[in-house]
């Protein structure tokens, strides 16, 4: 990897999307409503070859706040809230059964949160059974994954997940340094995570992911490298190493973080440079902008073939799926639309009580949106772009259609961060760290001064 010129690199740090969707969630609007979603369901059900389904269920509850977290969560310790939520999930599932063909093949199944394992094993089993009764056609090679908080994970949880066919677990680790954990209000010793991982391995879980975050308060390069040494002892198959997005104007809990303890941009870049070098020496290959996988892992093999895809859950080898979002604040996607459920429980429940799908907002994509989405997702996933693939799919002359955008990439080429070739362009290893910046050049919605986004570095 090129050595980072920190002074020059700092100029690229500006607010920008992470492109888990395009158009991004800030473009979702209330013009996309329940009827819009029902129409989208009908259109997709009646395609000649309907896409497989990906089911995402949001389980929003947490016992206490982790100050770094930007997820949609509800803090509670009340058992009755969980019981009530399950009853409303069942109402939503019944409405989905009437609104779409739920007998289509299911290729992916994911529990996110919140803390999914804050629900008891019996409750998790009840939720899973309810979903499987409505969506019964699980593929033989289905990916079933669940986010795990090691502080709320028991053998009984693992037994339930195993019995229901889960084969992928993602552990929220963040950092093993106690001073960092204290600053972000999430104490979980190495031994706790070690015990959870051993439990998963004992049950034959073959795909284990760790979520790590750099840029947290009290972090240093030396401290984070020590965390990575501990990580290697647990031998995860994949790592997601996120740049901490400090957006206290969006997430109030982040205001509890002492900003004087946050590492500087230069410190963050040093951490990033060192972690990439460390992980690659340990045989973890960089995937896209923030994931790592062992060289024999399916993610890396898909990257070699330029077949990776990116969605709200990260990177996947599944080419195209229609995501059905279930639960409060969950997001669904169908290639030509996005939909999001109500973000607060009151409106979510009220819609269901009235017999309506709890759609708060979304967006129907124009043909131009679909084209730009494909370009941006190819860049975000594979760090390169083959013009011919876009031209064949959309019947466009890429260089003519994106003449202005390609001109805007020239400075990256001059800086040695990207190279053009006869087929298209490819980012260098260091340039891949700026993939968000480069993707922004193809975003037709950016208006400048995007303060609602986190910084790209």
UniProtKB/Swiss-Prot annotation:
Could you tell me where this protein is found in the cell?
Answer: Cytoplasm
State where S-adenosyl-L-methionine 1 binds.
Answer: 56, 113, 147, 331
Q: How does it assemble?
A: Monomer.
Highest rank taxon of the organism? Bacteria
| Binding residues for [4Fe-4S] cluster | 62, 66, 69
Annotated GO biological process: porphyrin-containing compound biosynthetic process; protoporphyrinogen IX biosynthetic process
Q: What is its EC number?
A: 1.3.98.3
From the UniProt record, give the pathway where this protein acts. Answer: Porphyrin-containing compound metabolism; protoporphyrin-IX biosynthesis; protoporphyrinogen-IX from coproporphyrinogen-III (AdoMet route): step 1/1
Full protein name: Oxygen-independent coproporphyrinogen III oxidase
